Design a protein with these regions (language model features):
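N-terminal flexible segment immediately upstream of the FAD-binding catalytic core
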Residues: 1-64, 78-109, 272-283, 343-364, ...
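C-terminal substrate-recognition/cap domain of FAD-linked oxidoreductases
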Residues: 28-30, 240, 245-437, 455-458
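Anion (oxyanion) recognition and catalysis
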Residues: 67, 127, 257, 319, ...
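Helix C-cap/helix->beta junction micro-motif
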Residues: 68-69, 129, 390, 448
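Residue-level detector of anion-binding/catalytic polar loops
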Residues: 70-72, 132, 262, 324, ...
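FAD-binding subdomain of flavoenzyme oxidoreductases
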Residues: 102-104, 115, 120, 124-252
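Activity-critical C-terminal alpha-helical subdomain
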Residues: 349-353, 454-494
Length: 494
């Protein structure tokens, strides 16, 4: 086994001293996630990965070295939900230097980028050609595409088009032994035709590297499907329902997904807007006092005729269920109009900066913890009621904890639901309330068969693995085939 000094010396030889760090402050900064303090394991060494103008980099060399000496290794993008925390120490690869947008093909409507490319930058490049990713996120430049594919990236457009992983046409992946493979459309790169579809001559293996938490290989390139769309084609609406209308909300969402006319529906509750309304960011005089559920809805329409048809159908469904149109939220918390309120506009208008709901909430509360999972829309009312009851029992159903829901309705008649709780990480009593609540959520969620998206599955106890049955054994066998020394993000799968 090599000493730490020997490991550092070899890494310095591969990438240069400037790109290798063992600074304790760097370790803490790179280790933490959005749930600061939840994962305390630190990397032994941080390596900054950078590519040159021709796309050359040293990832394969680093992996060969790490594999030979059985050194754990994780790849990190921006901040994340915990999957890039180095549970076993070892090497942490900072992928942000592999950030090139390699090709935008307007004719074939795809984009090829390096695995560390900012999703924000990909959108910017696409918009120069009247294109965008069908699923666009609401975040700033820190989020990278490789991480989004590795751990179920989400964004607006899920109601019509699905996850970021559903946009993947091809991948270039570097395996634990340093071998580079191209999958899907990228297997056709270099031919006369070039990339054009995910299906090739062999079985589709893209799924091995999507939602895999970096445990099967390091994503070095991605090829993503884009759609023709200008920002002016996206039209924003918000309908509000009372707390006792959740059953009607559930039925409306199912009907809208079935009709396939809505581009996106974002489901939130009043807790998300409590502090923004108190600060005057949103005028609460223009929002019903009894409004509890907010359905932020986006329509994609290329012309007035298409918009009229889709808008009429959407309004009929919401209004017949008792919903109330609230332009105040649509104008100030959604889309291009929100840019007029500050410098933090599309595509991260509703989260980042002083004009975002999250910035406003944090000023009055503290750090937040979040659970993220998927389940069928027809269980929305049951799951919301269970979460509210758990939060009340734990003493966190109040403005000080802002126990909000922030969820995406998907094309699979499902909801990608995030339960938030804001808390004081330096108050043991508050942390105790948080842990009790998270345990209750884990129990009732596991019992019903949710699909967890964050934090990593290994934090969710034995029930999800038991439900997978022999499939989990097969996945472990595949992992052992491509990474026999289990150096890639150990602990993520086993």
């Amino acid at each position: 086994m090599l000493s730490l000094d020997e490991i550092i010396a070899k890494l310095t030889e591969i990438v240069g001293a400037r790109r290798v760090s063992t600074n304790p402050i760097d370790k803490i900064n790179y280790q933490h996630t959005l749930a600061y303090g939840a994962y305390r394991a630190l990397p032994d060494v941080i390596v900054r990965i950078e590519s040159d103008g021709d796309g050359n980099h040293k990832v394969a060399d680093i992996l060969k070295f790490a594999n030979e000496h059985k050194i754990p290794i994780v790849a990190k993008g921006g901040v994340g939900m915990g999957i890039s925390s180095p549970l076993k120490g070892g090497l942490l690869l900072d992928m942000l230097g592999m950030d090139k947008i390699l090709e935008v093909n307007p004719a074939m409507q795809y984009v090829i980028a390096e695995g560390g490319a900012s999703v924000y930058a990909i959108h910017h490049a696409l918009r120069q050609h009247g294109l965008m990713l069908p699923n666009f996120g609401t975040y700033g430049p820190a989020v990278v595409i490789g991480a989004m594919i590795n751990k179920g990236g989400i964004g607006y457009g899920m109601t019509r088009y699905g996850w970021i992983a559903d946009m993947v046409l091809g991948l270039e992946v570097i395996l634990a032994n340093g071998e580079t493979i191209r999958l899907g459309a990228l297997a056709n790169q270099g031919t006369t035709f070039g990339p054009f579809q995910k299906w090739i001559h062999l079985p589709d293996l893209l799924g091995m590297f999507t939602l895999a938490a970096g445990s099967m290989g390091i994503i070095s390139k991605v090829c993503l499907r884009a759609i023709e769309c200008w920002r002016e084609w996206l039209h924003d609406y918000c309908y509000v329902f009372r707390r006792d209308q959740l059953q009607q909300v559930q039925e409306s969402l199912i009907e809208l997904v079935r009709g396939e006319v809505v581009y996106d529906i974002h489901f939130t509750d009043r807790w998300q807007y409590h502090w923004p309304m108190e600060e005057g960011l949103y005028d609460k005089r223009k929002i019903p006092d009894d409004g509890w559920f907010f359905l932020k809805t986006v329509l994609l329409a290329r012309d007035a005729e298409e918009l009229a048809f889709k808008e009429k159908r959407m309004r009929r469904i919401y209004q017949s269920a008792g919903g109330v149109d609230v332009p105040e939220i649509a104008d100030k918390a959604m889309g291009a109009k929100a840019q007029e309120l500050g410098l933090h506009g599309w595509p991260d208008w509703h989260i980042m900066g002083p004009d975002g709901w999250c910035g406003t909430v944090v000023r009055h509360t503290g750090m937040f913890a979040v659970t993220s999972k998927m389940y069928p829309l027809r269980f929305l009312k049951e799951m919301y009621d269970l979460d509210e009851a758990a939060k009340r029992e734990c003493g966190i159903w109040d403005a000080a904890h802002s126990p909000q829901h922030d969820s995406y309705v998907t094309r699979d008649f499902a909801i990608k639901e995030e339960y938030f709780t804001f808390y004081n990480p330096y108050d043991d009593e508050d942390v105790g309330k948080l842990r009790k609540w998270m345990g209750m959520v884990q129990q009732f969620s596991n019992e019903r068969g949710v699909v967890w998206t964050a934090p990593t599955l290994s934090t969710k106890g034995p029930i999800p693995y038991q439900r997978l049955g022999s499939l989990y054994d097969v996945v472990k066998e595949i992992k052992q085939l491509v990474d026999p020394n289990n150096i890639l993000n150990p602990g993520a799968l086993y």
